Design a protein with these regions (language model features):
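Low-complexity, glycine/proline/serine-rich flexible segments
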Residues: 18-63, 105-118, 179-185
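Extracellular glycan-interaction patches encoded by glycine-rich segments
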Residues: 176-203
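Short tryptophan-centered beta-strand motifs in secreted/extracellular beta-sheet-rich domains
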Residues: 69, 130-141, 152
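Extracellular glycan-recognition modules
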Residues: 48-111, 143-146, 212
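Short, solvent-exposed beta-strand-to-loop segments that form ligand-recognition rims
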Residues: 154-181
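Short, Lys/Arg-enriched N-terminal segments with co-localized hydrophobic residues
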Residues: 1-21
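Short, aromatic/His-centered strand-loop micro-motif at the edge of beta-sheets
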Residues: 111-134, 193
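Short hydrophobic/aromatic patches on beta-strands that form ligand-binding or substrate-lining surfaces
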Residues: 67-75, 135-137, 203-208
Length: 213
Protein backbone atom coordinates (compact mmCIF):
# COMPACT_ATOMS: atom_id res chain seq x y z
CA UNK A 1 0.00 0.00 0.00
CA UNK A 2 2.80 2.40 0.86
CA UNK A 3 4.30 1.78 -2.58
CA UNK A 4 1.01 2.58 -4.32
CA UNK A 5 0.40 5.75 -2.30
CA UNK A 6 3.98 6.82 -2.91
CA UNK A 7 3.39 6.20 -6.60
CA UNK A 8 0.28 8.40 -6.38
CA UNK A 9 2.35 11.16 -4.77
CA UNK A 10 4.98 10.84 -7.48
CA UNK A 11 2.32 11.10 -10.18
CA UNK A 12 0.85 14.21 -8.58
CA UNK A 13 4.03 15.98 -7.52
CA UNK A 14 6.82 14.26 -9.38
CA UNK A 15 8.34 14.90 -12.75
CA UNK A 16 9.02 12.60 -15.64
CA UNK A 17 11.25 13.80 -18.45
CA UNK A 18 11.08 17.25 -16.84
CA UNK A 19 7.28 17.51 -17.09
CA UNK A 20 4.83 17.40 -14.19
CA UNK A 21 2.74 14.29 -14.77
CA UNK A 22 -0.32 15.82 -13.11
CA UNK A 23 -0.16 18.66 -15.61
CA UNK A 24 -0.21 16.09 -18.38
CA UNK A 25 -3.23 14.37 -16.84
CA UNK A 26 -5.07 17.63 -16.38
CA UNK A 27 -4.17 18.67 -19.88
CA UNK A 28 -6.08 15.77 -21.38
CA UNK A 29 -9.29 16.83 -19.70
CA UNK A 30 -9.33 20.48 -20.74
CA UNK A 31 -10.60 21.32 -24.17
CA UNK A 32 -8.47 24.46 -24.33
CA UNK A 33 -5.24 22.62 -23.51
CA UNK A 34 -2.85 20.93 -25.88
CA UNK A 35 -3.21 17.21 -26.49
CA UNK A 36 -0.89 14.99 -24.46
CA UNK A 37 -0.12 11.30 -24.27
CA UNK A 38 -0.04 9.47 -20.94
CA UNK A 39 2.23 6.46 -20.69
CA UNK A 40 0.68 3.16 -19.53
CA UNK A 41 -2.83 4.39 -20.30
CA UNK A 42 -5.78 3.08 -22.29
CA UNK A 43 -9.21 4.31 -23.41
CA UNK A 44 -12.11 1.91 -22.86
CA UNK A 45 -15.11 2.69 -25.08
CA UNK A 46 -17.97 0.58 -23.77
CA UNK A 47 -19.56 0.38 -27.22
CA UNK A 48 -16.54 -1.60 -28.43
CA UNK A 49 -16.87 -4.14 -25.56
CA UNK A 50 -13.17 -3.83 -24.61
CA UNK A 51 -11.42 -5.76 -21.85
CA UNK A 52 -8.05 -7.10 -20.74
CA UNK A 53 -7.80 -10.46 -19.00
CA UNK A 54 -5.38 -13.09 -17.75
CA UNK A 55 -5.50 -16.35 -15.82
CA UNK A 56 -3.91 -16.16 -12.38
CA UNK A 57 -0.82 -18.30 -11.80
CA UNK A 58 0.54 -19.37 -8.42
CA UNK A 59 -0.20 -16.50 -6.00
CA UNK A 60 2.02 -15.17 -3.24
CA UNK A 61 -1.06 -15.02 -1.02
CA UNK A 62 -4.73 -15.92 -1.42
CA UNK A 63 -5.71 -13.37 1.24
CA UNK A 64 -3.80 -10.15 0.49
CA UNK A 65 -3.51 -7.79 -2.45
CA UNK A 66 -3.39 -4.11 -3.40
CA UNK A 67 -4.83 -2.71 -6.62
CA UNK A 68 -4.50 0.84 -7.90
CA UNK A 69 -5.36 2.81 -11.00
CA UNK A 70 -5.95 6.29 -12.28
CA UNK A 71 -9.45 6.52 -13.76
CA UNK A 72 -11.32 9.18 -15.68
CA UNK A 73 -14.89 7.96 -16.23
CA UNK A 74 -16.73 9.25 -19.29
CA UNK A 75 -20.25 8.32 -18.15
CA UNK A 76 -21.72 10.16 -15.17
CA UNK A 77 -24.86 11.38 -13.47
CA UNK A 78 -26.86 8.43 -12.17
CA UNK A 79 -25.57 6.04 -14.77
CA UNK A 80 -27.36 2.89 -13.66
CA UNK A 81 -24.96 0.50 -15.34
CA UNK A 82 -22.35 -1.27 -13.23
CA UNK A 83 -19.03 -0.31 -14.82
CA UNK A 84 -16.41 -2.98 -14.16
CA UNK A 85 -12.92 -1.70 -13.37
CA UNK A 86 -11.23 -4.87 -12.07
CA UNK A 87 -12.68 -8.29 -11.31
CA UNK A 88 -11.88 -11.97 -10.87
CA UNK A 89 -13.95 -15.14 -11.09
CA UNK A 90 -14.37 -18.51 -12.70
CA UNK A 91 -15.91 -17.69 -16.11
CA UNK A 92 -19.57 -18.67 -16.17
CA UNK A 93 -19.90 -18.74 -12.37
CA UNK A 94 -22.16 -15.81 -11.55
CA UNK A 95 -23.33 -16.97 -8.12
CA UNK A 96 -20.23 -17.20 -5.94
CA UNK A 97 -16.46 -16.94 -5.66
CA UNK A 98 -16.09 -13.71 -7.59
CA UNK A 99 -14.71 -10.28 -6.76
CA UNK A 100 -15.57 -6.87 -8.19
CA UNK A 101 -14.18 -3.34 -8.17
CA UNK A 102 -16.51 -1.11 -10.17
CA UNK A 103 -18.09 2.28 -10.77
CA UNK A 104 -21.84 2.29 -10.16
CA UNK A 105 -24.29 5.20 -9.89
CA UNK A 106 -21.34 7.61 -9.60
CA UNK A 107 -19.91 5.83 -6.52
CA UNK A 108 -17.09 3.34 -6.06
CA UNK A 109 -18.36 -0.19 -5.44
CA UNK A 110 -16.15 -2.99 -4.06
CA UNK A 111 -17.58 -6.47 -3.48
CA UNK A 112 -16.25 -9.91 -2.65
CA UNK A 113 -18.24 -13.14 -2.78
CA UNK A 114 -16.75 -15.97 -0.78
CA UNK A 115 -20.10 -17.73 -0.39
CA UNK A 116 -22.11 -14.59 0.31
CA UNK A 117 -21.64 -10.99 -0.77
CA UNK A 118 -19.54 -8.53 1.23
CA UNK A 119 -20.32 -5.20 -0.41
CA UNK A 120 -18.87 -1.73 0.13
CA UNK A 121 -20.19 1.47 -1.48
CA UNK A 122 -18.76 4.93 -0.95
CA UNK A 123 -21.11 7.66 0.24
CA UNK A 124 -19.09 10.15 -1.76
CA UNK A 125 -20.08 10.50 -5.40
CA UNK A 126 -17.62 11.21 -8.21
CA UNK A 127 -19.15 13.34 -10.95
CA UNK A 128 -16.50 15.74 -12.18
CA UNK A 129 -16.11 15.01 -15.92
CA UNK A 130 -12.81 16.92 -16.00
CA UNK A 131 -11.13 14.99 -13.18
CA UNK A 132 -8.92 11.97 -12.94
CA UNK A 133 -9.30 9.92 -9.75
CA UNK A 134 -6.62 7.73 -8.20
CA UNK A 135 -8.12 4.63 -6.59
CA UNK A 136 -6.45 2.11 -4.27
CA UNK A 137 -8.18 -1.00 -2.93
CA UNK A 138 -6.05 -2.82 -0.34
CA UNK A 139 -7.15 -6.20 1.00
CA UNK A 140 -5.97 -8.41 3.87
CA UNK A 141 -8.49 -10.94 5.16
CA UNK A 142 -6.20 -11.99 8.03
CA UNK A 143 -6.87 -8.73 9.90
CA UNK A 144 -8.84 -9.24 13.12
CA UNK A 145 -10.70 -5.92 12.75
CA UNK A 146 -13.27 -6.26 9.97
CA UNK A 147 -12.89 -2.72 8.62
CA UNK A 148 -9.13 -3.25 8.23
CA UNK A 149 -9.65 -6.15 5.84
CA UNK A 150 -10.71 -3.89 2.97
CA UNK A 151 -9.30 -0.37 2.72
CA UNK A 152 -10.14 2.11 -0.01
CA UNK A 153 -8.22 5.25 -0.89
CA UNK A 154 -9.22 7.97 -3.36
CA UNK A 155 -6.66 10.59 -4.35
CA UNK A 156 -4.38 9.59 -1.48
CA UNK A 157 -6.96 9.79 1.32
CA UNK A 158 -8.56 6.78 2.99
CA UNK A 159 -12.32 6.57 2.49
CA UNK A 160 -14.20 5.87 5.73
CA UNK A 161 -17.73 7.05 4.91
CA UNK A 162 -19.82 4.35 3.22
CA UNK A 163 -23.48 3.94 2.32
CA UNK A 164 -22.93 0.18 2.64
CA UNK A 165 -20.08 -1.60 4.38
CA UNK A 166 -19.95 -5.38 4.76
CA UNK A 167 -16.60 -7.12 5.07
CA UNK A 168 -15.40 -10.63 4.28
CA UNK A 169 -14.86 -13.05 7.14
CA UNK A 170 -11.43 -13.31 8.71
CA UNK A 171 -8.98 -15.49 6.74
CA UNK A 172 -11.29 -15.84 3.74
CA UNK A 173 -9.69 -16.74 0.40
CA UNK A 174 -10.46 -14.25 -2.35
CA UNK A 175 -10.82 -14.96 -6.06
CA UNK A 176 -8.56 -12.09 -7.12
CA UNK A 177 -5.65 -14.00 -5.55
CA UNK A 178 -6.64 -17.59 -6.40
CA UNK A 179 -4.74 -19.74 -8.91
CA UNK A 180 -6.72 -20.54 -12.05
CA UNK A 181 -9.22 -17.69 -11.69
CA UNK A 182 -9.61 -15.18 -14.49
CA UNK A 183 -8.67 -11.57 -13.75
CA UNK A 184 -10.26 -8.93 -15.98
CA UNK A 185 -9.92 -5.18 -16.46
CA UNK A 186 -12.88 -3.35 -17.98
CA UNK A 187 -15.32 -6.27 -17.75
CA UNK A 188 -16.67 -8.81 -15.28
CA UNK A 189 -14.54 -11.95 -15.32
CA UNK A 190 -17.48 -14.28 -14.67
CA UNK A 191 -19.12 -13.09 -17.92
CA UNK A 192 -16.16 -11.88 -19.96
CA UNK A 193 -17.92 -12.20 -23.32
CA UNK A 194 -20.94 -10.11 -22.33
CA UNK A 195 -21.34 -6.62 -23.78
CA UNK A 196 -22.86 -5.44 -20.50
CA UNK A 197 -21.19 -3.65 -17.59
CA UNK A 198 -18.14 -2.43 -19.52
CA UNK A 199 -16.10 0.47 -18.21
CA UNK A 200 -16.47 3.65 -20.24
CA UNK A 201 -13.50 5.91 -19.68
CA UNK A 202 -9.74 6.16 -19.33
CA UNK A 203 -7.45 4.04 -17.12
CA UNK A 204 -3.77 4.71 -16.50
CA UNK A 205 -0.93 3.29 -14.38
CA UNK A 206 -2.82 0.14 -13.37
CA UNK A 207 -0.97 -1.76 -10.63
CA UNK A 208 -1.72 -5.06 -8.89
CA UNK A 209 0.48 -6.22 -5.99
CA UNK A 210 -0.08 -9.78 -4.83
CA UNK A 211 0.58 -10.58 -1.17
CA UNK A 212 0.64 -7.03 0.23
CA UNK A 213 -2.05 -4.77 1.63
Amino acid sequence: LAQLLRRWHECVCGHQHGVCIMSIIQGTSKSSAATFEIDQSIRFNDGDTPSLSRTIGTPTSTQKFSFSTWIKPCTFFNDTASRAIFSAATPGNSSSDRDIISWENDVLYVAFNTGSWAEIKTSQVFRDPASWYHIVVAMDTTQSTASNRTKIYVNGSQVTDFSAAAYVSQNDTIAICTSGKLQAIGAYAYDITSANDRIDGYLAEINFIDGQQ
